[in-house]
Amino acid sequence: MVLTKPISKTITSLLNLRERFNLTPTSNDQFSPEFTQDLPELTDSEIAALDQIRNRFLRHRERGSLAEGTINHLVISPLLALAGLYDEPFFVTTEPEVELFLEDRDEILRGRIDTLIIQQQLWVLVVESKSTIAFSVA
């Protein structure tokens, strides 16, 4: 019998995500070269904006857990704006439902994509960002 579970209650931490899907973090630059090669250099103002986003997040996170809306205001929206993903030719949609069928577990994980930006083959998405543990900008 297939069990249907909410993603936000089933995957509750990065450790849980790694264990559940057998994921291994890597800092190897060759892991996804299509995302790291031939990138333009960040300008001084872009670096300053990223530093400001990180510092705001860290200052607020120091006081405890942050709600999804707070994370969206402090981190997600400023990053999407800085990347130009609110402008032409991109389109933003929110809250489409997603289901992940895990055959080896006879399980369906169901949730919502918090933010989805689409432009042809480029998709930028934020999935179930309810409990953020860390934040990193490279």
Feature roles, as predicted:
Residues 2-3, 7, 11, 15-138:
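A short, conserved, highly charged catalytic patch centered on acidic carboxylates
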